């Protein structure tokens, strides 16, 4: 099995990877419009045969494990550091009842993290000593690409959401190095993306369609000098896509510039969950919702199918436990694992119940597990932001 690599940078396959997939030749590949292209594996006779294109799979595909990250810095979380660690431990414990969980933690904090997290559920929790700054591994961790018999990790060049010099800035140097260290640990080839972004900005149906907000990707704080068409081509070539459905989003009002994973999500090909702001939500977010609803109502996916959109009402901002401008009261930031969907509950009993019912209808073969994550949400993120899945390698035909 081979994976595409940036021009002039042919990685050395680790022993782990060779044991897992067998010896292979790793050719260099120019980025341009061809990343990733068909992987090539040498046959016993030495002839080369083309393998399917690597692409970003749907999150609903089967996982090998879930990655998370241990909150590291009081300079980021202040007096909420203990509370947010409790939330991370709660989420990790719940997910570990359905699939293995690996939590990266600074070497000096790993022992405390192991004690705090405990053994987890039936699939277990493992603490891996990799330096990090914060918990948002969806954004700074690898975005995985798969094909039959092949897997690679896309490094999306995390730059702290482009917030240097703004009130939203926080340290990110360690986070920016996590993808490389994590992929090395698991023997997965790393591919550098021809754009800058985050995993939370990318939502795919696994069949060639991507949902994305222009505010978070066509933005000079990530991709200066790139037009929307240029960003779209970079996304298509690096994620194995054929269609990008652009939503305007809203820049400058949160640290992510309105990531898609808090706004609209695929529950299946052709089916989208749309976040509907609850009572008390700022008018600017209601306008984003209306614009998004209008675009999705007229959109088709990569296979020409119109989208079926189900609205997921948010809670009443006056009825929830969490407060503050940055508190993310979005049920749409759920996470799908093997056999389960993990979604916040905010204390608005009626809205929490409605979210449960809508997600159970959308995922009838999965358990819907609701969790208290108020400390995480107070930092502007949710369960999806705090997790990243490693998909199972599809079998060869």
Language model segments and positions:
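N-terminal secretory signal peptides
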Residues: 1-14, 24-31, 37-38
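Basic, Lys/Arg-rich alpha-helical nucleic-acid-recognition elements, primarily the DNA-binding modules
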Residues: 20
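Sec-dependent signal peptide cleavage junction
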Residues: 36-47
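The feature marks the mature, well-folded catalytic cores of soluble enzymes
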Residues: 46-397
